[in-house]
């Protein structure tokens, strides 16, 4: 097992700030109120020649009645036994809190690998606050300022003493899959069903997943990187701050993905927001699988719902539809199989001679309308790139290619190039271009 360093503590003590400081970039969302990081986030880190996985957990609040915090507590408790080092973070500016004492009780069985991190020690006056934390009973205490980096180097020097000399096993390449959808349609449940691990907190509270979490995964000798994102809400429902930042990350996840799983609620059918999200995927030329989740409570049969989806999301006509019940694991294997199929089409490359034959076959069947009374010709065609498959046509009249004809042309290209389940980007240029 790879070296694992787990950051835990009650909400708003600076765990995510420390996480970001260690990995050197803004990964977890940081805001000044409790509960901002609600999911477990992992990233690769290195210090003094040793590599490790750093884990940022949600806030641990024992005995809380709040449903969400209970879920986070469970995740953290699952992580503690697997950790090589536990960074127990407390707030040195605020001082010792009763919740710190409650959390400490959970950690006493693992005291030999606990480093007590007193954060927010920004000046000499605050350094006096460190002494009271010795009452928690942990031997090694490190005053730091995660925000300014003070003391973090000394902390990491101690961390690496606990680590084994090994390389972190990571999936450097893989099919990047983003789960996109409105809040509470079951994206995190799908990720959990795939991973068979409660890595992402699942709660019926809409908007639970705030961070975009990249999770390497292997299935049937194929590498995947699953990206679980915050539910995307319409702008009118998003206030500035934490949700705004998460929506931006969700859109970024679409840009990073090879295949987007557009998750819709089968009990509601496709909504206006689903259409908007589908439009984002289409305009970015991403591979797509439409996932109709919660089929166990859908008022429609699979055949009926497929007809509705095809009508409402007609612009994603290349995307296969998978019906799932994520909480029961139903449809997960089929989903993974379709992701693989879509990716194969998304990365398909054809020789120029093959592309030219396909293009001229389409033109012979139905040429574009004449332009100002003149014949529209294609001098040659070629595939410029993949992800998406991009076909370039060199023509005498680029302006003659209207949208209706381009849609027809792309549909026929998909047939003749055997790219059935991925978008094709068509680029039309004149000779002078």
UniProtKB/Swiss-Prot annotation:
Record flagged with keyword Nucleotide-binding: yes
Organism listed in the record: Aquifex aeolicus (strain VF5)
Domain KH-like: 348-432
Annotated residues for binding of GTP 1: 9-16, 56-60, 119-122
Single GO term (MF): ribosome binding
Annotated protein name in UniProt: GTPase Der
Domain EngA-type G, residue spans: 3-167, 175-347
Biological role stated in the UniProt entry: GTPase that plays an essential role in the late steps of ribosome biogenesis.
Subunit record text: Associates with the 50S ribosomal subunit.
Keyword GTP-binding appears in the UniProt entry: yes
Segments crossing the lipid bilayer: none
GO terms under biological process: ribosome biogenesis
UniProtKB keywords: GTP-binding, Nucleotide-binding, Repeat, Ribosome biogenesis
CDD domains: EngA1, EngA2
Pfam families per record: KH_dom-like, MMR_HSR1
Binding-site residues, GTP 2: 181-188, 228-232, 293-296
Family (UniProt): Belongs to the TRAFAC class TrmE-Era-EngA-EngB-Septin-like GTPase superfamily. EngA (Der) GTPase family.
Gene name tied to this protein: der
Top-level taxon: Bacteria
